[in-house]
From Swiss-Prot:
This is Phosphopantetheine adenylyltransferase. Reversibly transfers an adenylyl group from ATP to 4'-phosphopantetheine, yielding dephospho-CoA (dPCoA) and pyrophosphate. Homohexamer. ATP binds at residues 10-11, 18, 89-91, 99, 124-130. It comes from Bacillus velezensis (strain DSM 23117 / BGSC 10A6 / LMG 26770 / FZB42).
Length: 160
């Protein structure tokens, strides 16, 4: 049986930190579904479709990664894909506290799907999509934080 994992997130926008987790997950699992979700508590800069397109562009060199979106519960999406794992990236202890809540709920909904936490590489431990958007909004350089395709998309969003 193939080892399948889901790597969920809002990815608004995708950063090098996200890509680090996706690449490392793809080295562990035979198939990784990157699932773009809408976080109802956030106002997204990019539409779900734009985020999916950017993710497809920056992961096109990773053959076992597929980018999709889902409107429902993450656990239902994971079951539909026959995933046995959910991959979550952690930057700091504060991330763990938040992720633990979601993991606990997912365990109640389906205890057969495990959550794997991956620590981001140190160079990305401070990085968040919110910080990237804030820097880009004021025309600051973001090339150290995001791939060129994402940098261009950010420039387009904030230029007008």
């Amino acid at each position: 049986m193939a080892s399948i994992a889901v790597c969920p997130g809002s990815f608004d926008p995708v950063t090098y930190g996200h890509l680090d987790i996706i690449r490392r997950g793809a080295n562990v699992f035979e198939q990784v579904y990157v699932c773009v979700l809408n976080n109802s508590s956030k106002q997204p800069l990019f539409t779900v479709e734009e985020r999916c397109e950017l993710l497809r562009e920056v992961t096109k060199d990773i053959p076992n990664v597929t980018v999709e979106t889902s409107q429902g519960l993450l656990i239902d999406y994971a079951k539909k894909k026959r995933a046995k794992a959910i991959i979550r990236g952690l930057r700091a202890v504060s991330d763990f506290e938040y992720e633990m809540q979601g993991t606990s709920v997912n365990r109640v909904l389906d205890e057969s799907i495990e959550t794997f936490f991956m620590m981001t590489n140190n160079q990305y431990s401070f990085l968040s999509s919110s910080i990237v958007k804030e820097v880009a909004k004021y025309n600051g350089p973001v090339s150290e934080f995001v791939p060129p395709e994402v940098e261009q998309a950010l420039m387009q969003k904030f230029k007008g």
